[in-house]
């Protein structure tokens, strides 16, 4: 009986520790379809407006690809955002102090990318209504 109780306690302890983990698989945004009729320039503007409004800094903007960096306290993430008039992607490029290892990263990175994606889509919908 004592062994069963110890085994149950061990299982609960291990389960509790795994629930506290902050690492998740990296969630890239791959070929997000743009449903509005937008030019490459309008898509670029929607991306840069979204990024800067959320604290991302555009560090490169060449040939339908934007590189953006976000710094939050000691953490930094860099993404590549290739785009066209029909789709865009947000791809992990590099990070500092986000526990990147084996395709996993701190969950805040995925939240930052999801927020960026949502804001880009919102900006594209606003641009669509102004046509």
Residues covered by each model-derived region:
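C-terminal motif of bacterial Sec signal peptides marking the signal peptidase cleavage site
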Residues: 15-19
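Ser/Thr-rich, low-complexity intrinsically disordered terminal regions
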Residues: 21-131
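Sec-dependent N-terminal signal peptides
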Residues: 6-13
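Positively charged n-region of N-terminal signal peptides that target proteins for export
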Residues: 1-4
